[in-house]
């Protein structure tokens, strides 16, 4: 546990259907093995389940556990059923499809939460196609009533869209349905914020512009001034011909002096003019201009948004070269925030 990295763990039903074979390996090739107890759930075609407990001892790379029932075609494995295991749980293709399809029907919140993490990690490791993942998650998301799991799933879906997929149309439709129909007001608000961040179609952007302009939030969705401010940044980037008007209008709406100064600092980062954005970036390389670190991070994030990543490529090297000075002059956590602002919105 004190070494970097984590084990890659895979549980498969044996060819004769009589046992569960679980193996672990060190993906970094150092031959390390992890001692831990793991839980797997074998799901049978008739809906019956079997909880299989596996204990890895020192120097143990694999384990074979006999099943109480004969596994047949249609059985699948849910790994890390209790959520306590440490590692990347690699899924077979059939198990990944089955786990995705069973998310809405899974009643156990711990198991559901563990599956969300496992499925997302398999997406990141390219063992699940992004299209398959998104399709299944959009079927599941409106059924989730647990606020923590809903929030996690919403973040995973947003990342899947930003990193792997070009067309957000179906995601826009599902999110807007949640914004307007979800029973929980917090879910409506969370869905709206994700909708705002991924909206790309002319219809979606136009809808956001209209509600921002009229300051009229969707029914049952209470938006704060910060929500409208964030929306103005997104709209200025999406609608460059209206960017100056949007920024000027939002600046005039803000009455709090501190928030007004914050907006004046950050808003040039969404300018449609490259020379203005270059000037903002150059100013961020000066330590004095990073004194309010959240403002600096927000400006850098806007400069490196996905829609402008071709122009933003030139910021990456000098921003990384500034890290040593940032470590010396900033808060202990600011280097992490700086790198996240620089890279997290690029694909």
Roles of regions detected by a PLM:
Residues 2-30:
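Surface beta-strand/loop "capping" patches
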Residues 52-59:
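Solvent-exposed serine/threonine-rich low-complexity stretches and specific carbohydrate-binding patches
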Residues 19-47:
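Polar, glycine-rich mid-to-C-terminal structural blocks
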Residues 15, 38-40, 95-97:
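Generic alpha-helical propensity signal that fires on short helical segments
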Residues 19-22, 61-69:
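Generic recognition of long tandem-repeat/solenoid scaffolds
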Residues 6, 10, 30-33, 45, ...:
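Long, ordered, helix-rich scaffold segments
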